[in-house]
Amino acid sequence: MNVLILAALVQVQATAVREVSLGKVDRVVSQDFTQIRGLRELPDGRVLLSDRLDKGVVVVDFGTNSVRVIGRTGRGPAEYKLPTTLTALPGDSTLLSDEGNSRIAIIGPDLKIHRSLNVMLPGGSMAMGARSIDTQGRFYLQIPAWMSNPQSPNANDTIPIVRFDAKARKVDTLLRLKGMSWLPPGPRYGFGWVVFAPQDVWTVTADGRIAVVRSGDYHVEWYEPSGRVVRGAPVRFERIPVTMEERLAYVREFLDNSMISGRGEEGSMSPIPAEMKDEKRVREMATRNTFAEMKPAFTDGALIQGPDGTLWVERSIRLGETPLWDVFDGSGKHVARVRLPAKRQLGGVGAHHLYVIATDEDGVQHLERYSR
């Protein structure tokens, strides 16, 4: 039975949130992709998409089943290397994270790259990755533990979210959240943090509202530009044990999505080569690293914003289960739960459609569109 998600959002029960599944695929783009990392629906219904390893940044047109490349791979103006997230900015512009060049880029409404820049905080020596830019040109970013507490970066897992005014050289701390659970300094094989330990996640809307999903009792908070904070009710969740198979799956995914320095052109960042991802190394990393006993309520993946003001949060699931997403409204209320088909991942949310990434047995990805 084809159950529309929009109907579920309207017909929410006061006592329980309904779980709905996607209906039939509306459209599929025939173009192959390798590693889709960012997606944003444009006002005219086309989709801006970033393929981190292969196609670069492209405009996808479902109506004509076509793909057009924006910019090109490189280190110069209007170029990028390993493009990742795409975030809506005021005025129909888009913020692109250029991971390979350690910078960000601004894509205008004309779908051209107008500017690439590094965000450097006062007194800092390393470029930072901004989550968003508001109408006044101020950057929103997360300060890592090694920078916010350089004397004892592993002492606690609380990190600040700041707003940086580059013109005034002013940094304002807006809130704090629970970050990764870092391990004490010392030699180790692999991760320096406790894998699957609960941590808060956040995002910023184009109008400057900050959404935070708190990991303690799993609830959503909205921080308004005026300073007003709106908190939703806690959401019940299942405690899922972390098995050895879960550990192995995590390590494989981590290596597939990680970078290594000195292997790319001119010593730049590049994907980890296959010889460093053999089964023996994967199992050794899964055995020797520190994992939490239970999975958190939700993953540490990026939050997805809907143009209707909804916030989409990916739930933790058991290995082998299909992806599950919770939907919250602008007040932090839990309004829906959406189950995806197998081998699918939610890429983006549009006004009338959901965009889903389908991955086949060979790791090839295709972009699917479903009606909301």
Residue positions per predicted region:
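Eukaryotic scaffold repeat domains enriched in small/polar residues
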Residues: 8-372
